[in-house]
């Protein structure tokens, strides 16, 4: 178990070094300098844009290339805006900041510029933990530069786990020590043990609402060796792995907040930070909030670690939800696409990323690079235990449904899982309905096209079965 140790705030420590290291910054500047002054436009949420400003301004000073205008909309709504731009083949926006799961759809629409040639010329490579750097690739090409390393981390209340009375009661009841959960049944047993609404403690802080809950379901499915489709694009959710995943998904209701079917992150996060939750899997950025004593009542009261595992072929299998991987993509219809590509590379450098990641006010960017895992500033923002947990989970990060039509497939999951969770569909009907609805989407988009997409989807799954 890794402890979430409360640490002092950064105070006056400078987060940005004015000159980037020669091996990653100078080559990008050299590649971009000949382009000249360029004003770029982006579709991006301001919550992400604000902490990006200092490195953006540094690049603009060095090259004359800057992002001078953004269309400010939230990241969950950007896919619709991006597809609208793609359908009109508009060159208005140069960069879009969105979840990498949209890459297959946007490539299929002819909207995205491959970035490998720009990266090679700029001597730039994403130095990601594990296989995380594969998640913005498609058909062997790189289409996105990571800026936000979203990954699920297991959180459990340290004070509850280390309480002597709790330890004795748990061992007396279950005949085993109160310990870090190795699998989903271990975690559910732990959540039920701590669940006590009368005292203001709910066992689970996991989300089950539309737009969020499906992420947990996919993680459970992957952890039992499941996959939404076979290579011929036949839906395969209604399988033993799917049944295991659905059981875990639905039983959470026993230890959840009564309003959880309608809660998103903005509703759940305050309850977690206030100490009203015993355990959950959540995006790593929450650690920065929980460990900030100025914003959290529970700083120093959390343990962070690897999410529980499932089982496939008789062996344990760990899969952590790496969704959405938020990336910068470049509009291939833009006359400024080269300038946009080099700006994206610059913002993906270690020095730019570490500044965004260690921002204690704007906490949307999360650590994802190898050097960040040993950077003292990152440890100060997340706690040493938090960083170790992020690294472990990044090593087994699994993607969203990485196919053309992602939003349609996600809508199918949202609808059926939601109806199952509130009792409008019987559990036995949920998986059958998902497979039937998936088959309709496959037919509408085209089986031949999706069979090609499937190859990339399967290829970007993590190779490790557990963290190193």
Regions found by a protein language model. Give the residues of each.
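Hinge/lid segment of periplasmic solute-binding proteins
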Residues: 22-34, 100-153, 188, 216, ...
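Extracytoplasmic/periplasmic solute-binding protein
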Residues: 139-148, 152, 179-235, 241, ...
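C-terminal lobe and pocket-closing loops
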Residues: 285-298, 311-415, 450, 454-468
């Amino acid at each position: 178990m890794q402890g979430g140790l409360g640490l002092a705030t950064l105070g006056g420590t400078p987060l940005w070094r004015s000159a980037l290291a020669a091996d990653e910054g100078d080559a990008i500047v050299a590649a971009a300098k000949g382009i000249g002054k360029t004003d770029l436009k982006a579709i991006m949420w301001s919550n992400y844009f604000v902490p990006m400003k200092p490195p953006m301004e540094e690049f603009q000073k060095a090259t004359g290339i800057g992002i001078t205008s953004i269309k400010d909309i939230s990241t969950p709504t950007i896919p619709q805006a991006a597809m609208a731009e793609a359908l009109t083949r508009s060159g208005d926006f140069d960069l879009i900041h969105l979840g990498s799961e949209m890459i297959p759809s946007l490539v299929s629409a002819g909207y995205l510029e491959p970035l490998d040639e720009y990266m090679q010329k700029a001597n730039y490579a994403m130095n990601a933990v594990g296989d995380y750097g594969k998640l913005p690739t498609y058909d062997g090409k790189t289409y996105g530069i990571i800026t936000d390393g979203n990954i699920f981390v297991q959180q459990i209340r340290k004070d509850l786990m280390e309480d002597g009375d709790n330890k004795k009661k748990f061992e007396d009841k279950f005949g085993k020590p109160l310990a870090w959960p190795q699998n989903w049944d271990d975690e559910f047993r732990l959540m039920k043990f701590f669940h006590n609404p009368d005292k203001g403690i709910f066992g689970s802080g996991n989300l089950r609402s539309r737009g969020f809950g499906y992420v947990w379901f996919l993680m459970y499915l992957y952890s039992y060796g499941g996959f939404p489709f076979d290579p011929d694009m036949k839906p395969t959710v209604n399988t033993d792995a799917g049944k295991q995943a659905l059981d875990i998904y639905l039983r959470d209701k026993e230890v959840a907040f009564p309003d959880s079917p309608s809660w998103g992150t903005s509703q759940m996060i305050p309850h977690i930070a206030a100490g009203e939750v015993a355990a959950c899997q959540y995006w790593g950025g929450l650690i920065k909030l929980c460990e900030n004593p100025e914003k959290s009542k529970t700083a120093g009261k959390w343990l962070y670690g690897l999410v529980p595992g499932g089982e496939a072929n008789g062996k344990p299998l760990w899969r952590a939800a790496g969704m959405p991987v938020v990336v910068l993509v470049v509009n291939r219809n833009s006359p400024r696409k080269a300038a946009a590509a080099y700006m994206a590379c610059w913002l993906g450098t270690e020095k730019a990323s570490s500044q965004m990641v260690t921002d204690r006010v704007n906490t949307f960017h999360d650590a994802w690079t190898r050097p960040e895992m040993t950077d003292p500033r990152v440890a100060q923002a997340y706690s040493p235990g938090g960083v170790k947990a992020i690294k472990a989970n990044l090593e087994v990060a699994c993607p969203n449904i990485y196919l053309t039509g992602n939003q349609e497939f996600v809508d199918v999951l949202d609808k059926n899982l939601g109806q199952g969770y509130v009792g409008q569909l019987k559990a036995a009907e949920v998986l059958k309905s998902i497979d039937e609805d998936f088959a309709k989407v496959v037919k509408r988009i085209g089986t031949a096209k999706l069979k090609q997409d499937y190859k990339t989807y399967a290829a970007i799954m993590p190779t490790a079965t557990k963290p190193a």
